[in-house]
């Protein structure tokens, strides 16, 4: 496939990630190409500048359209402005002020996150369906969320509205998640819920709330909230007997954990990892890993080595920054060891593995050309771990070409991903549609 950045695969993938939202209004083709032309390979500052310019232009166009009563252009402009703003801050790198302390986020990160939400909320009143802004109780916080509802003419006849709860992943925010499930679900008669959980979006940038591996605890509270919300708003006709969960990449791992909740009746897990430690150490010599974990090599040596390699690779520096920020850690060796907590493997407490808790139907996908996760060590192990899901209720989707979804998290193929997602959910919930 054509490369937008020929000698920078990380930048190329992230540019496709932005370009892929074009089908749902998150970008315009020429604007993306214009930005790409201004970015130098592996240069985060030109990346930030190029997308900031496009964001400012899109915001100005949206304001002009709003003033002239052009609803569609205003909606498109605010969506693009929000998405380009998100992209502009994507390559920010957190720093460690001293050894052992948590990383300090780039000072620009919080204002960017707030601007992304502000612009997106300007788009919400212009959407065809109703969107409710939520505050989901979690510890002493309120997780921000959106509930996207189908317009009346897109309701599924003769039944309440089925619900899809989408979990973000390692580096997304709920405004970006719009281009996955919410952009398509209401048109199919589904209500879709997104939220920023611990370690994600504004909850990370503003409050420093760290991620947790037992994501079922988070989605459990989201579902608790939905039960209360549906009871308080019976006119919405939300179907609490038809709740599904979804997510991509790390969000796919989260979706599988969420599916252990018996209130969840279907799960769509897009390109998840099976074990984060395996992912984090996949390209490191097993001999080196054994020497370190056996005590022959110190954590300090690993940290110094990673610091040296980070000077040579912006991608590695960025990856350490992202994981360290949402884990609340600064030491690369501690970050890697912390990844062991994010696993679906069997343990002494759960000999069959966490996935043995899942009994609902599951659509599981892998990415044949993933930049990060190979199919055999992650996708197929997830599939095999679903021992209590009948074979007829497990679907495996592993595309091998980019246009069919072979890039990680189905970047560049969101429309196809949604088509497969909602067809699967229709089957799970007994929804029959007439041919057109």
Swiss-Prot record:
- Which class of enzymes does this protein belong to? hydrolase
PANTHER family given in the database record = ALPHA_BETA HYDROLASE PSOB (PTHR22946:SF13), DIENELACTONE HYDROLASE DOMAIN-CONTAINING PROTEIN-RELATED (PTHR22946)
Q: Provide the family line.
A: Belongs to the AB hydrolase superfamily. FUS2 hydrolase family.
Quick check: keyword Hydrolase in the entry? yes
What keywords is this UniProt entry annotated with? Hydrolase
Q: What does this protein do?
A: Hydrolyase; part of the gene cluster that mediates the biosynthesis of a family of the mycotoxins cytochalasins E and K. The hybrid PKS-NRPS synthetase ccsA and the enoyl reductase ccsC are responsible for fusion of phenylalanine with an octaketide backbone and subsequent release of the stable tetramic acid precursor. The polyketide synthase module (PKS) of the PKS-NRPS ccsA is responsible for the synthesis of the octaketide backbone. The downstream nonribosomal peptide synthetase (NRPS) amidates the carboxyl end of the octaketide with a phenylalanine.
Q: What is this protein called?
A: Hydrolyase ccsE
Which InterPro entries is this protein grouped with?
AB_hydrolase_1 (IPR000073), AB_hydrolase_fold (IPR029058), FrsA_esterase (IPR050261)
Enzyme nomenclature, EC number: 3.7.1.-
């Amino acid at each position: 496939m054509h490369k937008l950045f020929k000698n920078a695969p990380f930048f190329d993938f992230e540019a496709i990630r932005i370009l892929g939202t074009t089908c749902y209004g998150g970008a315009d083709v020429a604007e993306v190409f214009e930005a790409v032309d201004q970015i130098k390979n592996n240069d985060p500052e030109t990346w930030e500048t190029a997308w900031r310019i496009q964001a400012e232009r899109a915001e100005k166009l949206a304001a002009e359209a709003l003033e002239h009563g052009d609803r569609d252009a205003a909606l498109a402009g605010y969506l693009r402005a929000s998405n380009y703003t998100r992209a502009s801050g994507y390559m920010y790198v957190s720093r460690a002020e001293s050894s052992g302390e948590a990383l300090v986020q780039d000072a620009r990160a919080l204002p960017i996150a707030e601007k992304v939400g502000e612009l997106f909320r300007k788009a919400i009143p212009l959407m065809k369906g109703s969107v409710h802004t939520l505050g989901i109780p979690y510890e002493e916080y309120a997780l921000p969320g959106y509930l996207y509802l189908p317009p009346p003419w897109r309701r599924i006849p003769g039944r309440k509205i089925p619900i899809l709860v989408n979990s973000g992943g390692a580096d997304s925010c709920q405004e970006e998640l719009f281009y996955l499930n919410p952009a398509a679900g209401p048109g199919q008669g589904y209500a879709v819920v997104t939220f920023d959980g611990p370690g994600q979006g504004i909850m990370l940038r503003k409050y420093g709330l760290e991620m947790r591996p037992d994501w079922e605890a988070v989605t459990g509270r989201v579902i608790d909230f939905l039960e209360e919300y549906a009871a308080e708003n019976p006119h919405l006709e939300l179907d609490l007997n038809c709740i599904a969960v979804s997510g991509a990449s790390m969000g796919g791992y989260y979706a599988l954990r969420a599916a252990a909740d018996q209130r969840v009746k279907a799960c769509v897990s897009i390109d998840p990892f099976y074990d984060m430690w395996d992912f984090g150490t996949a390209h490191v010599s097993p001999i080196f890993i054994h020497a370190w974990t056996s005590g022959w090599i110190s954590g300090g040596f690993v940290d110094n080595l990673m610091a040296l390699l980070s000077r040579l690779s912006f991608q590695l520096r960025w990856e350490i920054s992202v994981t360290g920020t949402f884990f609340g850690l600064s030491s690369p060796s501690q970050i890697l060891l912390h990844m062991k907590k994010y696993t679906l493997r069997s343990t002494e407490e759960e000999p069959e593995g966490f996935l043995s808790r899942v009994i609902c139907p599951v659509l599981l996908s892998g990415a044949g050309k993933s930049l990060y996760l190979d199919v055999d060590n992650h996708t197929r192990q997830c599939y095999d771990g679903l021992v209590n899901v009948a074979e007829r209720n497990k679907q495996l989707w592993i595309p091998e070409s980019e246009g069919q979804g072979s890039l990680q998290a189905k970047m560049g193929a969101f429309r196809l991903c949604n088509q497969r997602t909602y067809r699967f959910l229709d089957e799970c919930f007994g929804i029959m549609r007439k041919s057109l």
